[in-house]
Regions:
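Sec-dependent bacterial lipoprotein signal peptides
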Residues: 1-20
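Short, well-ordered, aromatic-rich surface patches in folded extracellular/luminal domains
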Residues: 22-45, 79, 94-148
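Post-signal-peptide N-terminal segment of Sec-exported extracytoplasmic proteins
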Residues: 42-72
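Short amphipathic beta-strand/extended segments with alternating polar/hydrophobic composition
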Residues: 50-57, 72-77, 117-127
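A short-motif feature that recognizes glycine-rich, charge-decorated loops
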Residues: 61-95
């Protein structure tokens, strides 16, 4: 009886060890969605085209509405040509973290560019001072967003 009890405890300890090892992977910081090119997160006060849009390299679009769920849609990968051209523009590397520079911490929309040069840029969509490369990128994403 004592031996079977010890074996049971040993088996339970091994199981907990394995589960904790598996669980440590999920507690690491979230990685980028596989195949994601860009994500546009509209601020909570957006009056037109609300929601967060993620664009994937295979033509997949996912539109999230807070806790209400997500809509999915696919476009032909050729429809992403303008966005991919905007993402390869060398001028993107010169963009700052926010536009205008005085934008408050939680204000504005956020554009996240995925890939090897991952970065997030916050901007005021009503600002007339956005750099042309950022305007082009936003226009490409919003054109895809308008398909919903």
């Amino acid at each position: 009886m004592a031996i079977s009890m010890k074996l049971s405890w040993d088996a339970l300890a091994c199981l907990l060890l394995v589960l904790s090892a598996c669980g440590s992977d999920t507690s690491s910081p979230a990685s980028d969605p596989p195949g994601a090119l860009v994500r546009l997160q509209r601020n909570s006060g957006a009056t037109t085209l609300p929601g967060d849009l993620t664009v994937f390299s295979d033509g997949g679009l996912q539109l999230y509405f807070d806790d209400r769920g997500a809509l999915r849609k696919s476009v032909a990968p050729t429809d992403l040509a303008g966005l991919q051209a905007a993402l390869t523009d060398p001028a993107l590397s010169s963009l700052a973290e926010s536009y205008p520079a005085t934008l408050p911490a939680r204000a504005g929309d956020t554009l996240t560019i995925y890939g090897t040069h991952r970065r997030s840029i916050r901007y005021d969509p009503s600002s007339p001072d956005l750099p042309p490369v950022l305007q082009r990128l936003i226009a490409e994403v919003m054109a895809l967003r308008s398909r919903f």
